Amino acid sequence: MKKIALLLTAFIGLTALQSCTIEEYYDENYYEGYSQVFELPNETLSTPEDAFTYSGTWNFTTPIYDSDNVLVYRWQGNSWTLVPVSYNLGGGDMIKYDYDFTRYDVKVYVSTSFPINELTNAEYNEFVYRQTFRVVVVPGGFQQKINFSDYNATISALGLENAPLKTLQLKK
């Protein structure tokens, strides 16, 4: 009798669990067309973080996925340079760009190895005043091998050559 009760319980349990399913949302177009590129034109990084660092923060128009990655490029005269990047000003002085991001925004920093208010006018104009950045959102599952240091190769691999540039507004 105990065996029949055990078998009956097992049978009922297996039948009841058959109806349990997990439904996951999968967006077919996620990897095709989700990549985005934003431009931050002529922005002055003017929010002081400390005596050595200024920053600027821009909100994404819509939150990005948790799994996405963000790349930031800085316009350097005639080409795009991948951030983070450092420049030697001479005499042991350095200036560096870096960034961080969340699902909701991207923040770009400019840091110096000395108090930033000691930059010459020429250095301030070259590295802080009216800087242009491009922010590229790369889907987290993107598997193609890309040379991320080359902006044009990155844009080409993501299929964004003809995509319109979206502009983000500086967070005040």
Which residues are covered by each model-predicted region?
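First exposed extracellular module after export/assembly in secreted or surface-exposed proteins
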Residues: 28-172
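Basic side chains
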Residues: 2-3, 134
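Bacterial Sec-dependent N-terminal signal peptides
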Residues: 3-5, 14-39
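Intrinsically disordered, low-complexity segments enriched in polar/charged residues with Gly/Pro
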Residues: 1-2, 59
